[in-house]
Amino acid sequence: MTKADIIESVYEKVGFSKKEAAEIVEMVFDTIKETLERGEKIKISGFGNFIVRDKKSRVGRNPQTGEEIEISARRVLTFRPSQVLKNALNGEVSDETTEGADDDDDEEGEGDE
C-alpha cells in the first residue's frame, strides 16, 4: 500500500474531497516524522509503537577482507506491533480492547542493541 492508496481510502471512507484527504494524510505523516526526528516514541493504541533508539559506535568487520572498521553511532527506528495487531494478522479474535492493549510494550528499560 502506498501513500496514494491511503489517501484514496480516506477519500472513499470519510467523504472528504481528494484534496482534503491528501492534506490530512500528509499532516498525519508530517506529525509522525517530526515527532520521531525529536527522538520521541509514538504509541498508537491497537496498532503499535514506533521507537527511536540510539546505537553506540562499535567495531565491525568487513566480511570480504576481514579488516576491522568502526561503525559510527546512529539512531535507528523500530516498530513493535501491538498484541491487538498481531492477533488480527493471525485471524484471532481478541478479548482485549484497543485501550491499554499496548501498555506492556514499554521499551524504557532496554539497552542498546
UniProtKB/Swiss-Prot annotation:
Keyword Transcription regulation tagged: yes
GO BP terms, alphabetized: DNA recombination; positive regulation of metabolic process; regulation of DNA-templated transcription; regulation of translation
Its assembly, as annotated, is: Heterodimer of an alpha and a beta chain.
**GO MF term set:** DNA binding; structural constituent of chromatin
Similarity field: Belongs to the bacterial histone-like protein family.
Which UniProt key words apply to this protein?
DNA recombination, DNA-binding, Transcription, Transcription regulation, Translation regulation
Source species of the chain: Anaeromyxobacter sp. (strain K)
Annotated Pfam families: Bac_DNA_binding
Alphabetical GO CC annotations of the entry are: cytosol
Compositional bias (Acidic residues) at which positions? 93-113
Q: What NCBIfam families does the record point to?
A: himA (TIGR00987), PRK00285.1 (NF001401)
Q: Which Gene3D superfamilies match?
A: IHF-like DNA-binding proteins
Which gene is this protein's source?
Answer: ihfA
Family annotation (InterPro entries): Hist_DNA-bd, Histone-like_DNA-bd_CS, IHF-like_DNA-bd_dom_sf, IHF_alpha
**Briefly, what is this protein's role?**
This protein is one of the two subunits of integration host factor, a specific DNA-binding protein that functions in genetic recombination as well as in transcriptional and translational control.
What is the name of this protein?
Integration host factor subunit alpha
Region annotation Disordered: residue ranges? Answer: 87-113
Top-level taxonomic group: Bacteria
